[in-house]
From Swiss-Prot:
Alphabetical list of NCBIfam families matching this protein: surE
Cofactor(s) required for function per UniProt: a divalent metal cation
InterPro entries per the UniProt record, alphabetical: SurE, SurE-like_Pase/nucleotidase, SurE-like_sf
Binding site for a divalent metal cation: D8, D9, S39, N91
Gene field: surE
Protein known as: 5'-nucleotidase SurE
Homology family: Belongs to the SurE nucleotidase family.
GO cellular component: cytoplasm
Keyword terms of this UniProt record: Cytoplasm, Hydrolase, Metal-binding, Nucleotide-binding
Any Pfam family hit: SurE
Cofactor note: Binds 1 divalent metal cation per subunit.
Length: 250
């Protein structure tokens, strides 16, 4: 299988290195990643600016851009052969609930899904800077080898792995997205006249405890796998909204 590997933590991160180290033993791996940290960039693309792309060798490229840029170049820049799977991660920190809308890790995988590729985003609860993510990468290898034939193109598969996990398929749970809320705060520094630098901070207010969610699985020590649809239409109100507007217009 030809696997494009990217992330939002940057080319130097241990998570992406672990995936390549493990997967290249059995698959053709093509690594293309941002030059630096690009967390919380979702599916941002460099539309109006050029990007500097550095070729290390035929299988390794560095992009001064966003994670979705990396996927786009990898798929359409004529640098790699035809890609079968877009793999984003391993992210340092989880992406669950509302996080998926902001995450550059999930955004990169979503861009692959839009272009009709198998797409998997992988995040870990282990945020230690010196952690190597080899155990997580081994689990990803097992998952890909056993289940890639059952996955659908056009779907983003979002996997979150607890820091203390059992590496077996019996420990995997298929889940739905939960909900997480944050209290956002900003601090101001370097204030000169009416100009200041704003820094985002804050804390988590809470997350869902509903059974069947990614949060419930993760915090019970299970690996969560959530299929994310590209179609974000809210079908629960579609007919009601259409009928309501039709009555008002007529």
């Amino acid at each position: 299988m030809n696997i494009l590997i990217t992330n939002d933590d940057g080319i130097a991160s241990s998570g992406i290195k672990a995936l390549e180290t493990i997967l290249q033993k059995e698959h053709n791996t093509y690594l293309i990643a941002p030059l630096r940290e690009r967390s919380a960039t979702s599916m941002a693309l460099s539309i109006y600016d050029s990007m500097r792309v550095e070729r290390i060798n035929d299988n390794h490229y560095i992009v001064d851009g966003y994670p979705a840029d990396c996927v786009n170049i990898g798929l359409h820049g004529e640098i790699f052969p035809k890609i079968d799977l877009v793999l984003s991660g391993i992210n340092r920190g989880v992406n669950m609930g509302h996080d998926v809308h902001y995450s550059g890790t999930v955004g990169a995988a979503r861009h692959g899904a839009i272009h009709k590729k198998l797409s998997l985003a992988v995040s870990s609860g282990n945020i230690a800077k010196d952690y190597d993510y080899i155990r997580e990468a081994e689990f990803v290898r097992k998952f890909i080898n056993e289940y890639s034939s059952q996955l659908k193109v056009g779907v983003v598969y979002n996997m979150n792995i607890p820091s203390d996990f059992i590496s077996s398929m019996e420990n995997l749970r298929v889940t739905k997205l939960g909900k997480r809320t944050y209290e956002d705060t900003y601090s101001q520094k370097n204030i000169i006249g009416g100009i200041a630098d704003f820094y985002l901070g804050g804390s988590e207010l809470g997350h869902s405890t509903e059974e069947g969610t990614d949060f419930t699985a993760f915090f019970s020590g299970k690996i969560s796998l959530t299929p994310l649809s590209l179609d974000q239409t809210d079908f629960s109100i579609l007919t009601q909204l259409s009928d309501s507007l039709s009555k008002n217009i007529s």
